[in-house]
Amino acid sequence: MRLIVLIYFTFLNILFSQQIVYELKLPKYLDETSALEYYGGNLLTLNDSGGKSILYEFNFDGVVINQHQIKTVKNYDWESLAADNNFIYVGDFGNNFSNRDNLTILKINIKNF
């Protein structure tokens, strides 16, 4: 039975494996990147777990072209990033130890960005 399960999961792994289409190297200061969002022809990311309150904008070569500092808030544990036509949303709701009660989603006006 174990052999059948092993063969089954090996087959699924091969069947659903993905090929890397595009790969780039980010600077070392983005070693805790936790989110990615397409924005204005570039990509936005952020650092996790108490990093600086900065959204990093980089191109498809991995070159950081802008650092958008968010001065009004602290990065407790930023985890997620999304955008629409008017706002960028940052999910500050990392809570690995279940000890935070200040979980929030930041709403940043693109006009102020």
Where does each model-flagged region fall?
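Hydrophobic h-region of N-terminal signal peptides that target proteins for export
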Residues: 5-17
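Beta-rich catalytic cores
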Residues: 32, 75-77
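Short coil/turn segments that connect the beta-strands within blades of beta-propeller domains
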Residues: 40-41, 85-86
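Beta-propeller domains
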Residues: 44-69
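Short, solvent-exposed loop/turn segments at conserved positions within beta-propeller repeat blades
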Residues: 48-52, 97-102
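Beta-propeller blade signature
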Residues: 57-60, 102-112
